[in-house]
Structures are given as structure tokens and as C-alpha cells.
Amino acid sequence: MKKSQGIFTVLVLIFGWSICKNYENRSYDWDLPGYVGSVLAAEFPGNFDKVHQLTFQSIKQEAPGSEFSNIISGNAARKSYYENSQSFSEQLPYYRVKVLFVAAIDFFYKLGFSLPKSVLVTNLTSCFLAGIFVFLILGHIFPQRVWLVFSLSLVIFLLPLFSDLAIAPNPDMFGFMVLLAFFYAYLKKYP
């Protein structure tokens, strides 16, 4: 038992280190305004101009110039969203439909993170929890093989895909974490 607790602690420390590295390498892309705007639209219902202004203002304050430029001018549609609050507000339903993800972003925003960082923290937290769930699921599947569980969990967590999903401002990592949580709950209920 102590051996598996020690291995779990080492795994958590490695996961934490990886999360810190991912935070340093965060990305800002064209999905970010949609999720930031979705949180603000709930805070300022019907005030499209204010939502539009605050969305792009908050991103501009944090994103490097080249990434912000890519967000607002990558193509004609993005340019239109940046220049026209009505056009931007018409896109928000495509983002607001991911209710749990937007609620998680809002939770971190209310904790004091900026909106762009709230999106990132939601994904990084989801990444960390997904890594824990991978470990727990593998531990359930291979109960007597602690080193195998540790090794597989570490390899899966350190895959570039895992990092890419953690830093991208979209709900993919969040959805993966929720899926793993349900799968783990299923395994615990039906051994």
C-alpha cells in the first residue's frame, strides 16, 4: 500500500510539473473569444457592444501581439467578429452550448482569474484530473501491477496530444476528463 501511495505522489508531482510547463506554453487561438464572450454574455445579457468590447480587450491585454493579431485577422470571418459586435454575438450560441465548460470558466473567473486565464486554468485543471483518472482506471484494470500502471499513466500524460489539448482554448480536454470520470465511476460501480 505504501509503495502505491509513493508512486501516486511521484506521479502527481510529475503531473504538476507538466501542468506548470503547459501554463508557460499556453496558446491563444480563435476559439478563445467565443468562450470569453460566452461568460460575459451571461454577465451582461443583451449588451452585445459591452460583451464584444470586454472580450477583445481582455484577450488583447494577455495575448502576445502576434497571437492576438492571428485571432482577429486570420480570415474574413474573424476580422468581422472583431470589428462588428453583432457578428460576434451571432457566433456565441455555438460556444454557449458547451454549458459545463462555460460554467467551469465562469467558476475560475469568479475565483479571480482573468477570463483568458480562466479558460486556460479550466483546461489545465481538466488535464491534471484526466491524468489522475487515467491512473485510477489503469489501477483498476491492473490492480497488482503498480509499476505498469505508473508507466502507462506517465506515458499517456506526457504524450504531446495531452499537452496540446491542455493549452488549447477549447473544451476537448474538459470533455475527455468528464468522460474518464464517468468511466471510472462505472468501473467502481460494476467491478
Regions found by a protein language model. Give the residues of each.
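Start-transfer (signal-anchor) and selected internal transmembrane alpha helices
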Residues: 1-19, 23, 27
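Multi-pass, polyprenyl lipid-linked donor-dependent membrane glycosyltransferases
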Residues: 125-126, 140, 146, 150-154, ...
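Alpha-helical transmembrane signal-anchor/signal-peptide segments
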Residues: 25-39
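Membrane-water interface at transmembrane helix exits
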Residues: 105, 109, 135-143, 187
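Transmembrane-helix motifs of polytopic, lipid-linked glycan transferases
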Residues: 121-142
